[in-house]
A protein has these predicted regions:
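Radical SAM enzyme core and accessory elements
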Residues: 1, 254-312
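Canonical Radical SAM [4Fe-4S] cluster-binding loop centered on the CxxxCxxC motif
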Residues: 1-35, 46-47
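Disulfide-bonded cysteines in secreted/extracellular proteins and peptides
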Residues: 12, 16-19, 233, 283-286, ...
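Secreted/processed peptides and extracellular or luminal domains of membrane proteins
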Residues: 18, 22-25, 239, 289-292, ...
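A short acidic, helix-capping loop that chelates divalent metal ions and anchors anionic groups
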Residues: 25-27, 115-122, 186-191
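Radical SAM enzyme [4Fe-4S]-AdoMet core and its adjacent flexible, acidic
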Residues: 36, 125-137, 141-271, 275
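Radical SAM/AdoMet-radical enzyme domain recognition
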Residues: 37-53, 62-181
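Active-site beta-strand/loop signature of hydrolases that rely on acidic residues for catalysis
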Residues: 56-57
């Protein structure tokens, strides 16, 4: 699906140790609403986009977010939001938000552990686990399509099977579940000694987690479960049916704030290639390269070519 990625602000109400953004990026002034709306127009004319995906920082802190959503909807575009859902813990806020923009958008919230103290230690915000959980339940109650996301990280990867059990015990099967390998950039790279985990170490926990998904499915619990940023050569082929490429990986436009080391103004970057995939030296020798999701570029650079086991 042709997508425009919007990052209107890097301001956030959490401070996750493996955030892909640098903390210094929060200093940038949010993108003006007029620039965002004109960027939607331009992306529609130039590339016939079908969806707007809004991230951050925390997009709910951007005061003009409802205007962005309603404008995109008027243009016939689908809306996706990546949010920690802390603000949705307030039922009154959620009701007001839904009254303004409707409930026909998709929202993804990441939980970093099913153990509240562990999650809070990663976000550096005490009580964030319970608030995000309340927020997600408020959204589900309001009819919003919700996805729960887990990023495989060095601090909690060994609890991934337990996390899967928690997802099935906590959320209805209409809630999708995605597992992603970590993008080692920004704060994640700065804190790599505790955030990075080699694929060979997380493999057994990921496979056990997917065994649990299969068990639930066989018992009639059918949930949309996907795994991203995971090369085929790092997991048993039995589990390949769960691995996905991002739909927008080869077809994304983006309106981004400048990077932490740049003073350039925001502008739309068109026809961006995904920052990764199966494009590394060992991948060229692999017979399944064309169907492989690959992984993040900086993650592959961090672990080196030895992480790959190409199929010949």
């Amino acid at each position: 699906m042709r997508t425009l990625f919007l990052s209107p602000s890097y301001l956030c109400n959490e401070s996750c140790v493996f955030c892909p953004c640098h903390k210094i990026a929060r200093r940038y002034t949010p993108v003006p609403i007029d620039l965002i709306l004109s960027s939607i127009d331009d992306a529609m004319l130039r590339n016939n986009i079908e969806m707007v995906l809004i991230s951050g920082g925390e997009p709910l802190l951007y005061k003009d977010l409802p205007k962005v959503i309603n404008y995109a909807k008027q243009c016939g575009l689908k809306i996706g939001i990546l949010s920690n859902s802390l603000k949705f813990a307030d039922e009154n806020f959620t009701q007001d938000f839904i009254e303004i923009v409707g409930n026909d958008f998709e929202l993804t919230t990441a939980f970093h552990s099913c153990i509240s103290d562990e999650h809070d230690s990663i976000t550096n915000i005490k009580g964030s686990f319970e608030k995000s959980l309340r927020g997600v339940h408020c959204l589900i109650k309001s009819g919003v399509k919700v996805t729960i996301k887990y990023v495989i990280n060095g601090l909690s990867y060994m609890y991934l099977p337990l996390f899967v059990e928690w997802v099935y015990a906590t959320f209805p099967d209409t809630v999708s579940f995605v597992i992603c390998n970590i993008d080692l950039c920004g704060e994640a790279l700065e804190n790599s000694e505790m955030t990075a985990v080699p694929f060979k170490e997380s493999k057994q926990y990921l496979e056990k987690a997917l065994d649990i998904v299969i068990k639930y499915s066989e018992n009639g619990r059918h949930r949309n479960v996907s795994v991203f940023n995971t090369p085929l050569c790092t997991i048993d082929p039995y589990y390949w049916k769960f691995l996905r490429k991002y739909e927008s990986e080869e077809t994304m436009d983006a309106l981004l704030l400048p990077s932490a080391d740049s003073a350039s103004p925001s502008f739309v970057r068109y026809d961006l290639k995904g920052d990764g995939g199966a494009n590394f030296a060992p991948c060229a020798e692999c017979c399944v390269q064309e169907i492989c999701p690959g992984t993040w570029r900086q993650t592959a650079e961090y672990f080196g070519d030895s992480m790959f086991n190409p199929f010949n």
